[in-house]
Regions:
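Extended catalytic cores of very large enzyme megasubunits
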Residues: 1-297
């Protein structure tokens, strides 16, 4: 399987430097019996290497290939590979899916998740979407922080126009995750994050609804809303909550705790005096109800 994988440019040719006879002797074919039908079918469908849809691995060879990739840079690589194989093949430990997919391959991307912050400029936004596509291609899960991107109605100096906010870009992110699945083995996985004071938060909370304009819906993408303690106190006090565009409050996203609360309250006072636009004040309890209701959509 190793030689065939290298010949078909699926595996790193450095794997041929291992003592393959020693590793082959360490295989325990009887451990295949630990799998039930569903487990074997999942390995066959998603994990085994194949050449034009013909699988070139069996379960124990698969585990050894993963172990070899992990031991590639070890001093006594055969001994370490056998150790890794032992814990994998006995199910004492199981690596993450990207490691199982990619260990020992030409692109040994072994990490499960990548977290990024999207900048507030067009080049940066589309560079982030491109990075999403490339990471998803090799089975990386994605978490994107979109809080820095200016909200709907914010001024764009370069064009003297107004921003369309984060939602149209999130539709592109959603469709990119669908188009660039994880090596053809499973759906792309992406979650976008927004803070509760962002002016687009109300529409953001509705992204996964089954009703409304489908051009402003992201049915295949997860969403996450960061909630500060101050917001929850406003909910309990039945107070108001002010929404801002991050372009008007550029430092707010970097603050937390008491520093965040001081800055947020100061920005609220400025908004009341008309010194910050656009902004919006909503009842905190209404926002809280919307957050809760979207958990069940």
């Amino acid at each position: 399987a190793i030689k065939k994988g290298v010949q078909n440019e699926l595996l790193d040719e450095k794997l041929l430097q291992f003592d393959l006879a020693r590793l082959g002797a360490a295989l325990k074919p009887e451990r295949d019996l630990q799998f039930d039908y569903l487990g074997l079918q999942t390995l066959y469908d998603r994990y085994f290497l194949h050449v034009r849809k013909t699988r070139i691995e069996l379960p124990q060879a698969f585990f050894m290939r993963v172990a070899m990739g992990l031991a590639l840079n070890e001093i006594d690589r055969e001994a370490r590979a056998i150790e890794f194989y032992e814990v994998l093949s006995t199910f004492d430990f199981m690596s993450s899916t990207p490691t199982l997919f990619n260990s020992g391959t030409l692109r040994s991307q072994l990490s499960s998740c990548y977290l990024t912050t999207v900048p507030d400029d067009l080049d940066g936004i589309y560079e982030s979407i491109k990075e999403n596509a490339l990471l998803s291609k090799f089975a990386g899960g994605l978490g994107n922080d979109w809080t820095r991107v200016r909200a709907l109605g914010s001024h764009i100096k370069g064009t003297n126009g107004e921003s369309q906010g984060v939602v149209p870009f999130l539709k592109v992110v959603n469709d990119t995750a669908v188009a660039v699945n994880q090596g053809g083995k499973r759906k792309g996985a992406v979650c976008t994050y927004l803070e509760s004071w962002h002016l687009d938060i109300e529409e953001f909370l509705e992204l996964r609804k089954n009703t409304g304009d489908d051009r402003r819906r992201t049915h295949d993408m997860n969403t996450a809303n960061w909630i500060p303690d101050l917001f929850m106190r406003r909910v309990m006090e039945k107070g108001e909550w002010t929404l801002f565009s991050p372009s008007s409050v550029p430092d707010l996203h970097d603050l937390f705790g008491a520093d965040f609360e001081r800055a947020y309250v100061a920005y609220e006072e400025k908004a009341k005096r008309g010194e910050i636009k656009p902004s919006k004040t909503v009842p905190a309890t209404d926002m809280w109800r919307k957050m809760l209701s979207m958990l069940f959509e």
